[in-house]
Amino acid sequence: MLLAGRQANALSHPVVLDPVGAGASPFRTETTFNLLEDIAFTVIKGNISEMKTIHSGSGTTKGVDADISDAVTEETLEATVAFAKRLADRNEAVIAITGAIDIVADRDKAYIIRNGHPQMAKVSGTGCMLSAVIAAYCGANPEQLLDATAAAVCLMGVSGELAYERMIRNAAGTSSYRSYLIDEISKMSAKKLEGGAKIENR
């Protein structure tokens, strides 16, 4: 990971960090900080518990999912937006905090995104998919990293909603939902994305 990150930096390619499980074990936390120390990341994407670990150096999560006590709610939204901007400033990177409410921020501006469906949590790998899409969008739009990241997050959320609608129509289950999600990502159009995105800026 270190060699790949260094080479990507040398080539001015976007580098996305998804610190899965940071705060859940000493090894994962130490690895996250080693990467942050050695590599300049374009985007840091994770759940709120992982982001709090990056900020403080330790966390309370017990696995790869966010600790329920950290969940972003309407009551904590403004404070979390301010936190995301501070973290972006400190790390010189776009911050994408994912969850029921997504926040994408740089030091000056934040987007709040309310797309997605709870069914997405029943499929392993959706976070990894999102990291890959963010990297692709940032690679295609290197001068608009914040907007590119927000668009990628919207894409995943809208696709999750459309996949769920298709699952219900077909009386299908979780395995089909995974395939439908990939289908919707691959079939997404600009018109469909713009029409479905539930996004505001702060």
Language model regions located:
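Short glycine/threonine-rich catalytic loop with a Thr-x-Gly-x-Asp
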Residues: 117-132, 145-146
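Conserved post-catalytic alpha-helical subdomain immediately downstream of the catalytic base
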Residues: 133-176
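Charged C-terminal helix
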Residues: 158-202
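Glycine/charged-rich beta-loop-alpha catalytic/anionic-binding loops adjacent to active sites
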Residues: 107-120
